[in-house]
């Protein structure tokens, strides 16, 4: 599954879709209309169910926060949280402007979501549509302190579509290789409860 806000990101998402389908993946992506839906479910319910049922997850953090209702976090943000909660095999891309905005606000003393909220800015237009984009990035890194050292998960910064494409192709080709190896080593995996 590819999770991202769509507005202004169509070219990037189209490229990722083509890359992943050319590697043989069935890609669930709302932009392409390929997320399984049910007429009895809300958009959010269908999206979260897709996260639950996907084999792997690519989250793309752009400068647009995505679809949200007043007082709620965006669908994309909720998808990210669900993938992390379920410990899905996952990768994240982040637009370089998100990193820049986070660093700028940190240097100004606004290092936490609470601090950024107290700042009173909802947006840093034209850079970011919503400051919660920085929260998404921080959640994707899953930063924790272990043995006195900060530990974070990899979130790949990208400047343009080519940068994002290189990371996507490299990571998902390697994942496909690993998946093939597991299937060869455990031919009865499906009988044991595996999906494939």
Predicted regions and their residues:
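Conserved catalytic or regulatory cores that recognize and/or transform ribose-phosphate-containing ligands
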Residues: 1-196
């Amino acid at each position: 599954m590819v999770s991202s806000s769509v507005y202004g990101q169509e070219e990037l998402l189209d490229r990722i879709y083509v890359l992943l389908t050319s590697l043989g993946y069935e890609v669930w992506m709302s932009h392409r209309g390929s997320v399984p839906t049910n007429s009895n479910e809300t958009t959010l319910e269908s999206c979260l169910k897709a996260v639950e049922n996907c084999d792997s997850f690519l989250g793309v953090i752009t400068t647009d926060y995505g679809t949200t209702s007043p007082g709620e976090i965006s669908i994309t943000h909720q998808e990210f949280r669900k993938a992390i909660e379920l410990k899905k095999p996952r990768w994240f891309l982040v637009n370089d402007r998100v990193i820049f905005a986070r660093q700028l606000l940190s240097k100004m003393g606004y290092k936490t979501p609470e601090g950024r909220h107290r700042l009173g800015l909802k947006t840093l237009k034209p850079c970011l549509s919503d400051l919660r984009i920085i929260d998404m990035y921080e959640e994707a890194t899953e930063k924790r302190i272990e043995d006195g050292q900060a530990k974070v998960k990899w979130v790949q910064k990208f400047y343009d579509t080519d940068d994002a494409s290189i990371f996507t192709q490299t990571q998902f080709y390697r994942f496909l290789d690993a998946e093939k190896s597991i299937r060869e080593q455990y031919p009865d995996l499906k009988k044991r409860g595996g999906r494939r």
